[in-house]
Amino acid sequence: MMLRNTRLATSLLRGLTLSILGLALTSPAYAADPVTLTLYNGQHKEVGDNLAAAFEAKTGIHVNVRKGSSNQLASQIMEEGDRSPADVFYAEESPPLNNLGEQGFLAKADDSTLQALPKEYVAANGTWIGVTARTRVVAFNPKLIKEEDLPKSVLDFADPEWQGKVGFVPTSGAFQEQAVAIIKLHGRDAAEEWLTGLRAFGKTYTNNMVALKAVENGEVATVLVNNYYWFALEKEKGKLDSKLHYFTDGDAGGLITVSSAGVIKASKHPKEAQQLLAYMASEEGQRVITNTTAEYPMRKGMVSDRGLKPFEELQAPKITPADLGNAEEALELERDTGLL
């Protein structure tokens, strides 16, 4: 009888021990560490931060955001190689993504993500997506110049008559993309002549917002910028004196460019990284971005609700992000003409 009781007690004790062990192994202390993604963000800081916060709120996946310039971060990814901590790269322009994709640093995006966007705004090999779009414009001050007196083509700003009347940002990725568009449309010589004329007769600024404020304050009559800077300044100051002019007839002055993103091939969390990329292309993710910056959503069927000129009314040149390549030729020309 005593032996039977001893065996029963031993069996109960073993069962209790296994139960406790099972509970311990499923407790938070023994659970797998939660995933944290690293986003290399070349877009504007507020855009990347808001996107990361919204994605974490939806999925529970934390996103560590590292901010830098698009070109700087692309170079860092190439230097880091397989050791890169980056999971997703989000650039303000497409050339850095084009460059990384061509050199094999990006993983192919999920088909469902690619199919949510127009094919002309994703990489041909599927390694990156265009997230949102913006258009090049001329911001002008009506107190200094009438809209009807603006040139018919952005190329005309290189003429002597515009001396001291046009501002631009030679270090801007979008300006460099515009130079590539001129190369594609008119040839290298025309692009070099344009850059040479701007250097001789235009005013250079350190960044686009500084340039735009120069127009707003009457320091210069016109500047070449992206449309969303004007809306950002309007949000900050209220009604503005300056206005936007949109080039037509496929002129390079109305070039459409895109912010872009891709999953890093060396990502330690490829599944979750693809989730973040898909979120950027989703309706919710696109609204988070376009509510932060006045850009056009790229998701099929979506339209801007920020009072922008309708996307379908833009008369942009037929130049795709893929056509812009890595913008190296434009950088060479800027160096040759003394702009960089």
Residue ranges of predicted features:
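A ligand-binding cleft/hinge motif common to bilobed small-molecule-binding domains
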Residues: 95-99, 221-242
